Design a protein with these regions (language model features):
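Glycine- and charged-residue-rich phosphate/anionic-cofactor binding loop of Rossmann-like
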Residues: 128-131, 149-166
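Short arginine-rich
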Residues: 169-179
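Short polybasic amphipathic segments
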Residues: 96, 112-124
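A short glycine-threonine-serine/GTX helix/turn-capping micro-motif
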Residues: 56, 129-137
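A general structural signal for well-ordered alpha-helical segments in protein cores
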Residues: 139, 143-144, 170
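Contiguous beta-strand/loop segments that form the cofactor/metal-binding neighborhood of enzyme cores
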Residues: 1-112, 142-156, 185-190
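C-terminal lid/capping helical subdomain adjacent to the catalytic/cofactor pocket in oxidative enzymes
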Residues: 164, 178-190
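Hydrophobic/basic alpha-helical segments enriched in Actinobacteria
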Residues: 107, 125-126
Length: 190
């Protein structure tokens, strides 16, 4: 897995808002240019994406602007995950593809679609999630579950073993990127 922070972050002063910047007329990330270019993102005044406080790899405060992972499963299936946060409009990219001998499944989180393709049959399917079922709300859902668990008002929707397994996968992915080789993912033994 590789993660990069090459686009955002930079030399602008910390806590700089677009409305305070003398480059807002030609900065592609300013609210007026996001509106003019229909490039998406927050169209109200916001912190500068090129400020020192946006993060950088050198000091461990990386603000990811893209990530990729190549996965190989025991069955021989391969998977690819990618997210490119600075890609906009029709080029927006965040998803995963897993292909085995019998078929391929592709997740497109920007379009809220799941594609299933059977390799040896003339059938394919596309499932579309409603707009309120977006993948992008995951962090707030995790926080909601955590608060409910602490307060004793709800049961978690996901077992702790799944969270630990996810952490193991992330640690293995980081080691794989650092070492430039495949790394076995430690398994949960609960």
């Amino acid at each position: 897995m590789a993660t990069r922070g090459h686009v955002y972050g930079g030399r602008k002063k910390a806590n700089l808002y677009c409305s305070q910047c003398d480059e807002q007329d030609h900065c592609l990330e300013s609210p007026q240019n996001r509106i003019r270019n229909t490039s998406g993102g927050r169209t109200s005044d916001h912190l500068c994406l090129f400020g020192r406080d946006c993060g950088k790899a050198a000091d461990g405060t990386l603000n990811e602007d893209c990530s990729s992972a190549l996965l190989e499963f025991a069955s021989g299936a391969h998977g690819v995950y990618t997210q490119v946060f600075y890609a906009r409009r029709d080029a927006a990219a965040r998803g995963a593809t897993v292909s085995g001998y019998m078929g391929t499944v592709r997740f497109d989180w920007c379009a809220n679609e799941l594609h299933r393709i059977r390799h040896h049959a003339p059938f394919s399917a596309v499932e579309r999630a409603s707009s309120d079922a977006s993948h992008f709300g995951g962090d707030s859902e995790l926080a909601h579950d955590f608060i409910g668990l602490i307060e004793g008002t709800t049961e978690p929707r996901t077992p702790i073993a799944a969270g630990i397994q996810s952490a193991y996968a992330c640690l293995a992915a980081r080691e794989s990127a650092q070492q430039g080789r495949f790394v076995a993912v430690r398994q949960v033994g609960l």
